Amino acid sequence: MIKNLSKPFKWFFQLEAASGLVLLIAAIIALVISNSSLSNLYFDTLNQYLFIGINDFGLKLSVHHWINDLLMAIFFFFVTLEIKREFIQGELSNLKKALLPIIGAVGGMVVPALVYVFINLGNSETLNGWAIPSATDIAFSLGILSLLGSRVPISLKVFLTALAIIDDLGAILIIAFFYSGDLSISYLSLILISYILLLTLNKFGVKKFIPYLIIGAFMWFFTYKSGIHATIAGVLLASTIPHRIKEKDFSLLIKLEHAISPYVAFIIMPIFAFANAGVSLEGLSLTSLLEPVPLGILLGLFVGKQVGVMVVSFIAVKFGVAQMPDKSSWLSLYGVSILTGVGFTMSLFVGNLAFAENIQYIDGVKIGVLAGSLLSTVFGYFILLYASKK
């Protein structure tokens, strides 16, 4: 039964096996260009401002912000659709299996933060970066996992997707409560009203996407203006899309999954990678990794993440609180735990907010995030590759 229910998820990740390579190529090209004679063109293009709206109603954002706030809201919308279906009738419909990524995400946020704090004790300025290694870059971690294709069971891909979504929601909440300026109560109220309207559409069984899309677009605008990262609007919208078990492959949720998955896999994710992987390495050196900020981030991402996710998951399974994903081993779960240390763009984003008043630490953030994410990518990939052969 699970095999039949997971067909849409398998279908998407078969696409992802190809798109993971496209994403990796896009990231490498961006990194090369941003450290070449074309770097000014690259950064100037991303920093160009575009106005989208009607008359005075709209937003004027840089190309980079449109990609990170709008396109990634669509990405979060898609992966939340996937996870919602898995909670209703798939891999996560079993409570004990559903609890594992939730518990793992908590460990994956707390332990890296503790590692960073331990290394930066005594320095009130650098302690402000405690949340940097707590984030997971969902697009890159899934992209790396997808390179392994069918050698990784669908259940582990579901586990990583669910964990990364929870992780990123945690990061968004951390940003909202610890690093944001004043949150707008009026816009937060409008978000709540929008969400209630969406739930009402779901309650009355509205199966046309247009009403959801219109309200969702306004909710995205309200979310952006509220001071909370706008990608959360994609999660909220997806959570209200109707799906009933008896509808099988004909629900609005399933139709949307199939309709937008190739665009997410081959357009949105590569564009995101190209726009965010371009980090200038000028002035960075490996010796600077020994400084408290980069060392705390490096160890938080590469050590703290895998220890946090793996240890709490192991304890939860051994005490019967949670259940292992189907067809997975402890070694393969460990490999996925390492991949959660790919913090990359989310960690860089949190780092820029954490040290907005102390920009002298930004270079340290960059090298710490790049080193920690790279180590997590390489070790996670090869551990999973080895586990697939056993």
Swiss-Prot record:
Membrane topology listed for this record: Multi-pass membrane protein
Gene Ontology CC: one annotated term: plasma membrane
Subcellular location: Cell inner membrane
Signal sequence residues: none
Keywords per UniProt: Antiport, Cell inner membrane, Cell membrane, Ion transport, Membrane, Sodium, Sodium transport, Transmembrane, Transmembrane helix, Transport
GO MF term list: sodium:proton antiporter activity
Transmembrane segments: 13-33, 61-81, 99-119, 129-149, 158-178, 181-201, 209-229, 259-279, 297-317, 330-350, 367-387
Catalyzed reactions: Na(+)(in) + 2 H(+)(out) = Na(+)(out) + 2 H(+)(in)
Family to which the UniProt record says this protein belongs: Belongs to the NhaA Na(+)/H(+) (TC 2.A.33) antiporter family.
Protein name: Na(+)/H(+) antiporter NhaA
Organism: Pelagibacter ubique (strain HTCC1062)
Gene from which the chain derives: nhaA
